[in-house]
Amino acid sequence: LGGRKKHKLGENNSPLSLGTMVVGSNAIPIPRVSLSLSEVHLLKIHSNPIKIKGGLSHGWLDKGIYTKAPLLHEKWLYFSYEQENYSGHLGLVHEAVWGGATETFGSQPTSSEDFFRVFFLLGGSGASTSKEQTNALGNHLGMWDLGVRIKKANYNYHVYLQHPFEDQSGARWLLNYPDGLWGLSIQSQNKKAKMTDFLVELLYTMHQSGSEEVSDSTYGWDDYYNNYLYRGGWVYEGNVIGNPMFTLGQNEIRNWPHIVNNRIMALHTGVKGFISKNVEYKMWVTYSKNYGNYHDKDRSNRRGIDYQFDSGLTQLSYRVDLTTYKWFPQKNIATTLS
């Protein structure tokens, strides 16, 4: 399968959600070729199936601030277990930006051997930068995705966590253990109820494997969605590829577009239902405290520059969508407040 196609990775598929932690619908689709494995039965435990699904993609990112556009490597693998009234899933999503060229570091290696190194998160060859040789070739990020679904009475419940990682050190779970998108979704089996769906999510990305000052410099300051080499960030065509709560911008510390805000505490709720037989509503409310990122804060303090996120910036956003089906089938009338 190839070309531009809507592509999202993550099991939090409610339209009320903030979005996934790695690949969502905030940016337009990235051109790619993909191979995927549809959900198939792997084995059975007490007559209940364990299923597996996954995929592999090769993509082409935009040139942006680079002198040559970098490449995208992507793979994902999910396991699920089902019983009559509940199921569980565990998945791993891995993304890597590699190749391309920058003004500062020049052309990056793209041989078949280099692809092998990117695939297995191995250090780079002598043709790569010193940091790539000691850590891993390319900019690596991803998430662990786990959750449980329960059917009880007239409702379906989904409890989930998407835990992000950045580079090799972040992939070790306990180093940034509090960070992630924590969620609860409740869906009524009555599709015309006054409230058919309710969702609450907590986005927390404050830890990032800790402060670099109290580490041995082999981890810390994960700086989600940013990278020293691919400094444009986890972005495609000017939009964040992952969760839209992460803010793209620039400042006098790093005077190029990058993720200026990735240390976030946000509480998000969504409600969906029917006001009447033919009028559906959706409502979202998000409250967040935003603390910028470790790197910009540290450099601002060392230069004696006021840092705009020092005390945390507060944001409260609302959105209400109304859809009528009687006179104009699936005609949307939307009201947005923020």
Predicted feature descriptions by range:
Residues 1, 33-39, 77-83, 146-150, ...:
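Residues on the lipid-exposed face of transmembrane beta-strands in outer-membrane beta-barrel proteins
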Residues 1, 40-52, 80-89, 150-156, ...:
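Short loop/turn motifs that connect adjacent beta-strands in outer-membrane beta-barrel proteins
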Residues 1-73, 81-99:
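Outer membrane beta-barrel
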Residues 2, 54-56, 88-92, 157-161, ...:
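Membrane-embedded beta-strand positions of outer-membrane beta-barrel proteins
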Residues 6-9, 39, 58-64, 83, ...:
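Transmembrane beta-strands of outer-membrane beta-barrel pores
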Residues 27-36, 69-75, 82, 140-144, ...:
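Residues that define the transmembrane beta-barrel architecture of outer-membrane proteins
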Residues 90, 100-218:
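Long, internal scaffold/assembly segments composed of regular secondary structure
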Residues 209-300:
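C-terminal structural cap/anchor segments
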